[in-house]
A protein has these predicted regions:
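Active-site-proximal beta-alpha core segment in soluble small-molecule metabolic enzymes
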Residues: 3, 7-10, 15-17, 31-196
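Glycine-rich phosphate/diphosphate-binding loops that line cofactor/substrate pockets in enzymes
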Residues: 20-31
Length: 197
């Protein structure tokens, strides 16, 4: 009797490309997309998918879960930015900064330490702000106090705040009530940050 320990999935890259093109048709023309290809593209080959998407001008970059995944993409000579969505440990920060891997920031204290390290290294660090709009994981809660904290982060030396994101925890459900509440929180924070420059 044969024992199988792994699952094999054959991915049609033409189908992936078609799906991406269909998504692009459903958003505003000047909107860029980020390809989330964490966990090796959910087992479908992150590098192969990234290489397929690399020439697409509407793909801003790639998002992964860990630094190891980011370095794998960097080692594949991809030019577009790579963002680590998950938790990053202080002993990984210098590697991220050296390799221009984008980092998720979820506290002022973390951003300040990262800024100081980048300054000491004579480099810039590119960060994205994670908002917790209801997923209850990492991220800034939606408060005026945190809007102030994020505004302070944007002024730290050697730190470039490139973006802000959240995780819609129930977006695949038919009832969009909770997702719409999350979107409202995100948009509220966006407006609060605009007020603060």
């Amino acid at each position: 009797m044969k024992h199988y320990t792994r699952v094999l999935a054959r991915v049609d890259l033409d189908a992936v490309e078609y799906n991406i093109e269909m998504m692009k048709k459903n958003i505003q023309k000047d909107t860029q997309m980020m390809a989330v290809i964490k966990m090796d593209g959910y087992g479908h080959g992150a590098v192969q998918i990234a290489k397929l998407l690399e020439p697409k001008d509407y793909i801003w970059g790639y998002a992964v879960a860990t630094l190891d995944e980011a370095i794998l993409l960097k080692d594949a000579c991809l030019k577009k930015p790579v963002l680590v969505l998950g938790c990053i440990f202080p002993d990984q920060w210098d590697t991220m900064i050296r390799n221009e891997v984008r980092m998720t920031v979820y506290s002022y204290e973390m951003a300040k330490e990262v800024s100081e390290l980048a300054e000491a290294m004579g480099c810039k660090v590119y960060v994205h702000i994670k908002l917790d709009t209801g997923m209850a994981r990492l991220g800034f809660q939606i408060t005026e106090e945190n809007a102030e904290e994020i505004a302070k982060i944007s002024k730290l030396p050697n730190l470039v705040m490139e973006g802000m994101f959240t995780h819609f925890s129930k977006s695949d459900e038919a009832d969009k009530t909770f997702t719409n509440e999350q979107l409202d929180k995100y948009l509220w924070m966006k407006e609060e940050l605009k007020k603060r420059g």
